[in-house]
């Protein structure tokens, strides 16, 4: 018979933790190899196994209610039932581009959890504002998280990023952010560092044990404010309207310097990453507008969190008018 009583030792739930992370912690607490926990509970897990079949027996073994476990682990959330309390705004674990990262180590310690925790997260959660730790791009384990108290502009950029999603909509900011990173770091690769800013930043971010962050991680942290500013520019509609009306992107290019993203920026050739992105961006919109399909927009611009039901989003920033004929809200 399957075990229906809690295991001798249980572990605390952690918000948005991945199922594998939770199973690993529960197994470790009971001195079991991770791959032996589910067989002990007589739970068979394969790629074709519906995830919710694990919910009831796992909740019993963990000594928590079914509802508590369901709300803690996004894999158990039903994305087709967005009006269920606690689901709206949670990471979509089934998304192909869903992000898993280590939780802030100081947050887990504050929760009384000693073992590492991996969470489903969203593109904007790069800084833990409570503890001023970099927890985003470039972090693969909790020990790599860097205290960024000495670079307050990066902390402010986290708040700016959050404000951008309120202004433009999470869907569009999320779509622009990875492209902004790619564009900006391509620019950096072709520029010199005459003042050795990178080495100075690495020395500034060296921890108490004398360990400096890796070069790529330092770049991600130091230039995060510029990446966020570029994200806001690309996610906005002003440049799009001006480009459609005039047939050129002069205004967009001027804003790169005016907003302090890259001083003196002038694209020298059509292969410039920003120009290539603009062409690709308009091609996607023209393709979607021609087919006039919401599914195509959902494929090109997926929602990374569970959205509210359709009737709640009539005037939401998550939907937009197509910039090309035939005009319709997508």
Residue ranges and their predicted role:
Residues 1-330:
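Basic, alpha-helical nucleic-acid-binding regions used in initiation and control of genome expression
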